[in-house]
Amino acid sequence: MNLIPTVIEQTNRGERAYDIYSRLLKDRIIMLGSAIDDNVANSIVSQLLFLESQDPDKDIHLYINSPGGSITAGMAIYDTMQFIKPQVSTICIGMAASMGAFLLAAGEKGKRYALPNSEVMIHQPLGGAQGQATEIEIAAKRILFLREKLNQILADRTGQPLEVLQRDTDRDNFMTAEKALEYGLIDKIFTNR
């Protein structure tokens, strides 16, 4: 069951009810609180574009609590974050794993945060293939290409050498907020506002 809270706001015209996500969007806050698939990515991209159209000079805040998900869907969010004019700050609440960690690191440098008990996990892309040998070979080449591409972007975003990223993403690599800060995935740990 997916319950979405509703909030009531008093205005000079009376009361207005919002679902919580729409109300947060008014404050330029976007929640990524699920696995990343095409539907989630389309929703996040749409919100980023909408907020840019509202005010291209005001920051957008992307809160992340995600186990990761589709690389192509995540790259749509990443590319949009880099494309739009407003700076996007990222805040890890709970867990930013896999593509969630990638998007956390994709925030504006100096504006990537985590709460103290958050966890971040990086690893190499996951995939599978079936079919004829040539189809399996094509899929394997693609996933190796994606691994190198993601590692290079993470190296650029964190300041870590590419060789370190290749080693550290070989297996699931879980980090506390403190370790993510040392690693360069985030810039600060928030303890209060």
Curated annotation (Swiss-Prot):
Q: Which PROSITE patterns match?
A: CLP_PROTEASE_HIS (PS00382), CLP_PROTEASE_SER (PS00381)
**EC numbers on record:** 3.4.21.92
Catalytic residues identified in the record: S98 (nucleophile), H123
Q: Where in the cell is it found?
A: Cytoplasm
Highest taxon above the source species: Bacteria
Q: Is Metal-binding among this UniProt entry's keywords?
A: no
Would you name any one GO CC term? endopeptidase Clp complex
Substrates-to-products reaction catalysed: Hydrolysis of proteins to small peptides in the presence of ATP and magnesium. alpha-casein is the usual test substrate. In the absence of ATP, only oligopeptides shorter than five residues are hydrolyzed (such as succinyl-Leu-Tyr-|-NHMec, and Leu-Tyr-Leu-|-Tyr-Trp, in which cleavage of the -Tyr-|-Leu- and -Tyr-|-Trp bonds also occurs)
CDD domains on file: S14_ClpP_2
Question: Which family does this protein fall into?
Answer: Belongs to the peptidase S14 family.
Q: Which PANTHER family match?
A: ATP-DEPENDENT CLP PROTEASE PROTEOLYTIC SUBUNIT (PTHR10381:SF70)
Q: What is this protein called?
A: ATP-dependent Clp protease proteolytic subunit 2
Q: Which organism is this entry from?
A: Bacillus cereus (strain ATCC 10987 / NRS 248)
